[in-house]
Amino acid sequence: MANERKTEIITRDHFSKFLDSIDIEEQRSDNPKIDKLLKSASKKGGGKGYPEFIISYKTNPDLLIVIECKADVTKHESKDRDKYADFSVDGALLYASYLSKGFDVLAIAVSGETKQSLRVSHFLHLRDEKKATPIFGDKFLSVDDYLNGYLKSPEKFRQDYNSLLDFTKQLNEKLHTYKILESQRSLLISSILIALENTAFKRSYASHKKPENLAVSLIQTVSDELESANITGKKLENLNTQFSFIKTDTSLSKKRKCLERNY
């Protein structure tokens, strides 16, 4: 008789090697956001439902891994992927569809009772997307490989690009209301995007109590990032001069809401 516990043990043993980087929850979650999203995710309809494993990254809370297990390899995936309670792919995709309303989700379907017979399928369901996309191969990977593959995937690139377009459009409209010249708006948006690539700035910008101090920090960070990109000498000096208006334009450095709320 097929024993799903064997499948779970194999899966648990693999991911338990990475507990320095991840947290593993089994058939429940202490995260209120996750719990709320799964409140009607029962595979049989009605009520809460939970996958065998929910894995979250300690350094990247935007991504969840959900894993659904079946002992019988013939119960790996149904033709229409709508037999949620009976097939591992179907169930994993169901949970991913619910959790993708608040997270990017890597859904992993596992079937088989031995390492030799194990079947593994991976799907990436990005937040607010309508469907999941196959990704990776048919073997377990390390959690670092999962994270790096997700971050570098074409799907994630497209999501980030679209988010960036929305951000720059909204920011441009906001700056227009402060009567910032179009040429200066472009420079300011560029400076913000450059500065946000700097981890230290990204973590600390909200701590500035005065917009004047934030403006100084922004310009210094941009200069540091440009220098790190091997832009030096006269070229760096010219770029710093172009960005310097951020410190001197009173509509930016004096109006509290303008610069502070642009990130």
Residue ranges and their predicted role:
Residues A71-H76, Y161-I180:
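Short amphipathic alpha-helical segments and their helix-coil junctions
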